[in-house]
Amino acid sequence: MVRRQLLLLGAGILLIGTLAHVDRIFFKRNGSFSIRFLYSNLSPNPKWDLPKPTPEEDQRVSEALRQKFYYLAKGTHCYAFQSEDNQYVIKFHRYPSHMRIFSWINHPLSYRFSERRKKIKAHNFKRLDVNLTSYRDSDQFLKDETGVIFTHINRTDHLRKKVTLVDKTKAEYQISLDDVTFILQKKADLIYPTLDRLYSQRKLDEAKQVITHIILLITSCCQKGFIDEDPVLKRNYGLLEDRAIHIDVGDLIKNEKIRLPENYIPHVKEMTGDLRKQLEDLYPDLLEHYNETVNSL
């Protein structure tokens, strides 16, 4: 009898371990996307309150959400989905395990007793404050510089909108937007592939305009008192038809001193150092335009 119970227990443990392993493989193949990561157990904080959408914003958001959004990428703090017509991206904040609904499932005891987990928890709350502040400020002060259409942080009951998400396995999810933290943004083209295409087609005037847009974007943010703490041009900046924008809106930090020309001019040069190197190595015909634009600040 005891032997049979031990065998059943062992088989149960083996089955659970196998299922957990299979689940982990599926999770990785699905772009590390899980619907659970979108829902937080945090209480609404007045610090993150944002105005209700205007009638114009409400209509624009509703029009954008009439289509499905397909899995695009997992960033440092968000999942991104692109619209069927490739005009929009919707990003959802990806909450750490201890901030999710049913947080005890992942680490039922360690966040209470493990010093390492306590440090991780403190770090996560600090990063959350940085990210949500950046989302809020991007919506309130930097819409032109970020292409943000609408931002929602705290749980609410007034949006009454849903969006259909499609993950990498083609599974579909209906998400109530009142319940999650999200940013609806214009979809932008990446900078370096665009430069490469224009240069190979010898559309040098358009390529020069791209360079101008990038420099003016960084300058505009500085003049409004914001700097980017993750200034990777190749993945975090993009191009719309008429301007460059910040694709990543989670690391834009308030810095009043950067408003001064003696501070923002060297900052712009530093931020575009990688661009200058690319021009030197790959697009030498465009280097003079870069130098002229930077020197005219």
Task: Please describe what each predicted stretch is.
Residues 20-229, 240-241:
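Conserved ATP-binding subdomain of kinase catalytic cores across diverse folds
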Residues 202-210, 223-229, 239-297:
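C-lobe/activation-segment region of protein kinase-like
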Residues 234-236:
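Conserved protein-kinase catalytic-loop position immediately C-terminal to the HRD catalytic Asp
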